[in-house]
Amino acid sequence: MCGGCVQQEYPDRGSTCLETGSYLLNYVSCVQCNKRDFVLIVNKTAAEEDGEEIITYDHMCKNCHHVIAKHEYTFSVVDDYQEYTMLCMLCGRAEDSVSVLPDDPRQMAPLF
């Protein structure tokens, strides 16, 4: 992974978890060839361990094939919530939790 290719390493993305794609606003240019071109997604794998889906891939420079960052995305269901996480030097770090119920109990206002 290369900190010289990005503006900020592991930026906080709040609840934005990317299963695929690249956060190009954080991409400066390839430190190896000094070009700012498309970022390829290579070596993509999907695995499931103990009910957790894990997707990993590499962000790679289109021109010189320099590996910019390694991306990891996870998805799991815990109790009544879908849990998402993302960790990537280019795309950032993020977590999200979404209720599988029609009305999220955490969003309901107290009656009293």
UniProtKB/Swiss-Prot annotation:
Binding site for Zn(2+) 2: C30, C33, C61, C64
GO biological process: fibroblast growth factor receptor signaling pathway; positive regulation of DNA-templated transcription
GO molecular function, one term: zinc ion binding
Residues annotated for Zn(2+) 3 binding in this entry: H59, H71, C88, C91
Pfam family, one: Churchill
Positions contributing to Zn(2+) 1 binding: C2, C5, C30, H66
Gene3D superfamilies: Transcription activator, Churchill
Top-level division of the source organism's lineage: Eukaryota
Keywords: Activator, Developmental protein, Metal-binding, Transcription, Transcription regulation, Zinc
UniProt function note: Transcriptional activator that mediates FGF signaling during neural development. Plays a role in the regulation of cell movement. Does not bind DNA by itself.
Family listed: Belongs to the Churchill family.
Protein's UniProt name: Protein Churchill
Native organism: Xenopus laevis
